[in-house]
């Protein structure tokens, strides 16, 4: 009896083992394809599908173009039909704080009254200078004598301000400090300012401080020769000419060397 039970229990085992082996074989088929490493291509494909426009019929498209309907517009215009143009009418508000500040400053400067205290009409003769010094002396010092010392800094400031505003010339701070009488101011303007005002060659150059350039015409002696100034434009022109000549000589030398090498 025990032997029969053993045989009966042993028989179903091969069937189960075959079923398990078949289950494993079916499960392996799930992983038979190769893995796709480009995972982001799925999102790219979905995005392209969303923005893809349907293809229109050729006959309908030709008809729309002939009739001039809005549906026949180009693809670029259809994509941009819902976009606003960057024009001032489409902006709301006053912009950034910096732009607002610049507008306020521009408006304030344009509306501010500037005091043009320096005269635009400049004196050019000795007679005008004599009249100007006399007016400044009488108004600020109450005297006619031009060789009198200034009583204090206030009187000197009033005199120099009146003289500069009426003559149209600014006087350097060094001269304003060292000169002490109206006569000294008169001599300074007559010797330093009026000659350069009447002769542009004697004009003061800020790029070359204290540079008064003499010319050969100013000296009658035969043993004095003055070399005239060479401007930067003339220097550049001369330099370009020299470089062109050098380049030409080098090209000729190279050409002769090549001809000699070919003939050898």
Swiss-Prot record:
Any one GO molecular-function label of the UniProt entry: structural constituent of ribosome
Stored InterPro entries: ACP-like_sf, Ribosomal_m50
Gene3D superfamilies: ACP-like (1.10.1200.10)
Entry's Gene Ontology BP terms: mitochondrial translation
Entries under Pfam families matching the protein: Ribosomal_L50
Self-association and partners: Component of the mitochondrial large ribosomal subunit (mt-LSU). Mature yeast 74S mitochondrial ribosomes consist of a small (37S) and a large (54S) subunit. The 37S small subunit contains a 15S ribosomal RNA (15S mt-rRNA) and 34 different proteins. The 54S large subunit contains a 21S rRNA (21S mt-rRNA) and 46 different proteins.
Misc note: Present with 1350 molecules/cell in log phase SD medium.
Family membership noted in the UniProt record: Belongs to the mitochondrion-specific ribosomal protein mL50 family.
Name of the featured protein: Large ribosomal subunit protein mL50
């Amino acid at each position: 009896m025990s032997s029969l039970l053993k045989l009966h229990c042993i028989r179903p085992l091969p069937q189960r083992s075959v079923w398990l082996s078949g289950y494993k074989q079916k499960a392996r088929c799930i992983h038979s394809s190769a893995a796709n490493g480009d995972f982001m291509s799925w999102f790219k494909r979905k995005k392209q599908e969303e923005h893809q426009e349907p293809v229109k019929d050729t006959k309908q498209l030709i008809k729309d173009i002939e009739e001039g309907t809005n549906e026949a517009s180009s693809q670029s215009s259809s994509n941009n039909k819902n976009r606003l143009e960057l024009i001032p009418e489409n902006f709301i508000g006053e912009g950034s704080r910096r732009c607002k500040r610049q507008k306020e400053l521009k408006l304030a400067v344009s509306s501010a009254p500037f005091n043009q205290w320096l005269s635009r009409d400049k004196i050019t003769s000795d007679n005008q200078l004599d009249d100007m010094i006399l007016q400044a002396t009488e108004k600020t010092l109450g005297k006619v004598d031009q060789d009198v010392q200034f009583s204090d800094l206030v009187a000197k400031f009033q005199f120099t301000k009146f003289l500069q505003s009426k003559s149209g010339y600014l006087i350097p701070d060094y001269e304003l400090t060292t000169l002490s009488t109206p006569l000294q101011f008169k001599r300074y303007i007559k010797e330093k300012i009026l000659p350069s005002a009447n002769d542009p060659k004697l004009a003061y150059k800020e790029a070359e401080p204290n540079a008064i350039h003499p010319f050969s015409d100013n000296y009658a002696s035969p043993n004095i020769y003055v070399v005239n100034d060479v401007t930067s434009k003339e220097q550049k022109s001369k330099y370009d000419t020299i470089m062109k000549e050098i380049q030409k000589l080098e090209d000729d030398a190279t050409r002769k060397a090549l001809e000699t090498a070919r003939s050898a």
